[in-house]
Amino acid sequence: MSQDDFPAPASGFVVTHFLVVSDQDRSREFYRSVFGATVLLERDPVILRLANSWLILNVGGGPTDDKPTVTLTTPPDPNQTSAFLNLRVADIAAAYADWSAKGAEFLT
């Protein structure tokens, strides 16, 4: 992966969402096939360019020497979460139809 693919901002900052996933390959393919994400790094971690942002997908881990009290893990119950992505679109009906046809599931 080239630094040009995942550049630091010239000024200010960019928010990159880090998702802890149980299956990197399945998650990478979901974001690629449903949302058209560009895969910048295949795994460990997966790095994706999605629209005008980036996603990092990695399995849980930790603690580490610099974060001895922090462990990253997927939720024990798939019906409970502490994070989600809110994707704003120009045409919600069209996005719902397109993404549903590609396998996305919606909570609402």
Residue ranges and their predicted role:
Residues M1-V15, T38-T108:
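Vicinal oxygen chelate
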Residues F18-Q24:
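Conserved beta-strand-loop-alpha-helix junction that forms the acyl-donor binding cleft
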Residues S27-R32, W99:
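Conserved active-site tyrosine of GNAT-family acetyltransferases
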Residues Q24-D25, I92:
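Generic non-transmembrane alpha-helix signal with a bias for helix starts/N-cap capping motifs
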